[in-house]
Amino acid sequence: MKILAKQEIFGMARAGTVTNKGTVYEIYVNTNDEGKIPHFHFRDMNDWENFHTCIRIDIAEYFHHGSKQDVLNAKQKKLLEDFMCSPTKKVRYDETGHRMNNWQYVCDLWDSNNSDVEIPGDTIQPDYTEL
């Protein structure tokens, strides 16, 4: 595999992708994240410098840091919200036996890969259209 100079190399756990006007955005959680605020990344899958932002998992709020300063437009917010509310691509079940949605999966990815800070079990799924 050829690594381009502009690519970052780190562990990531991809939750999925959404597409807007031909641009594919990936939603992922970094593994062993040094930050103590549970968040996920939303970025242009093919051009990381074109669009990249971070969003908190527990509330509808941006977690801007470093070069990750972009803001979602209304269409991107709706795509993100629809994605988070949708069932996971691979069938997964929560502890009550209900099928997991993508937001629950993102929570699980954070908790599985970032042991310093876990998301409380009573956290309510935010409405990401309110970003």
Q: Where on the chain are the PLM-derived regions?
A:
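Metal-centered catalytic cores of metalloenzymes
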Residues: 1-131
